[in-house]
């Protein structure tokens, strides 16, 4: 059986923690930032975990993560 391919776009967007959870970046931090408060932009700069509903899909895209 041939090797499975990693989805490269997903590999650039998601990471995996030591405990096996997937991390992601938050949205809304690219542009139109002037109307967003400093507190909000700080919070958006922190990473987040992938929701449990999407873990199976992400793990299929990243078979070797």
Curated annotation (Swiss-Prot):
A GO CC term assigned to this protein in UniProt: cytosolic large ribosomal subunit
Superkingdom in the source lineage: Bacteria
Region (Disordered): 1-28
Pfam families per record: Ribosomal_L35p
Keyword Cell membrane: no
Keywords: Ribonucleoprotein, Ribosomal protein
A Gene Ontology BP annotation from the UniProt entry: translation
Gene Ontology MF terms in the entry: structural constituent of ribosome
Family: Belongs to the bacterial ribosomal protein bL35 family.
Protein name: Large ribosomal subunit protein bL35
Native source species: Solidesulfovibrio magneticus (strain ATCC 700980 / DSM 13731 / RS-1)
Lineage, top ranks: Bacteria, Pseudomonadati, Thermodesulfobacteriota, Desulfovibrionia, Desulfovibrionales
């Amino acid at each position: 059986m041939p090797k499975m391919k990693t989805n490269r776009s997903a590999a650039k967007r998601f990471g995996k923690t030591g405990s096996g959870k997937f991390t992601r970046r938050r949205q809304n931090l690219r542009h139109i930032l002037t109307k967003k408060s400093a507190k909000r932009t700080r919070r958006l700069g922190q990473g987040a975990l992938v929701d449990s509903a999407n873990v199976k899909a992400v793990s299929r895209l990243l078979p070797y993560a």
